[in-house]
Structures are given as structure tokens and as C-alpha cells.
């Protein structure tokens, strides 16, 4: 196989890996935590993974503390937690 063909194959495999959903066995434990606004009073739109619904949902984050099941974008949430 030519070097161009090998690069194409490597690129396709890398793309496939990036698009493969996270399996439940690979999902970080913090994805099971509930949404947690935290004690601060800010209004920040954030996303958390809801294990019962098996999807990422929006919630209002207060801006401090909370827990690790807190993502700035739905895409980041899906990449990390969604199966």
C-alpha cells in the first residue's frame, strides 16, 4: 500500500474512533452523578448526563462547586458520557 493510502486509512480509523459512542463500561463514574447547580447564584447554561434517560440534558449551573457531571457544551457531554 502506498504512503498516501496508509495516511488515508489512518485518518479514517481516527475519525471512526472519535465518532464511536462511549460504552457504559468506559463511561466515567461522575456521569452517574445528578445535576448539581452548586451554591452560587449565577445563571450559566450547562449540560449534564442523565443516566436514567441515557442522554445529555441542559440545566442551570450557579457558577461554583457542583460536581464533575457538568459540561459547557452538549457535544462535550455526549463525547464524555453518552452511550
Swiss-Prot record:
MF annotations from Gene Ontology: serine-type endopeptidase inhibitor activity
Limits of the BPTI/Kunitz inhibitor domain: 31-81
Subcellular location: Secreted
InterPro entries referenced in this protein's UniProt entry, alphabetically: Kunitz_BPTI, Kunitz_BPTI_sf, Prtase_inh_Kunz-CS, TFPI/VKTCI-like
Highest taxon listed in the record's lineage: Eukaryota
Keyword hit for Glycoprotein: no
Signal peptide: 1-24
Disulfide bonds: 31-81, 40-64, 56-77
Residues carrying the site annotation Reactive bond for trypsin: 41-42
SUPFAM superfamilies xrefs: BPTI-like
PROSITE patterns per record: BPTI_KUNITZ_1 (PS00280), BPTI_KUNITZ_2 (PS50279)
Function text: Serine protease inhibitor.
Name under which the protein is recorded: Blackelin-4
Species annotation: Pseudechis porphyriacus (Red-bellied black snake)
Amino acid at each position: 500500500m502506498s504512503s498516501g493510502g496508509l495516511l488515508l486509512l489512518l485518518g479514517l480509523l481516527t475519525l471512526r474512533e472519535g465518532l464511536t459512542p462511549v460504552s457504559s463500561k468506559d463511561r466515567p463514574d461522575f456521569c452517574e452523578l445528578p445535576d448539581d447547580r452548586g451554591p452560587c447564584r449565577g445563571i450559566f447554561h450547562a449540560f449534564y448526563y442523565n443516566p436514567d434517560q441515557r442522554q445529555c440534558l441542559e440545566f442551570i449551573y450557579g457558577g461554583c462547586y457542583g460536581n464533575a457531571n457538568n459540561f459547557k457544551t452538549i457535544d462535550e457531554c455526549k463525547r464524555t458520557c453518552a452511550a
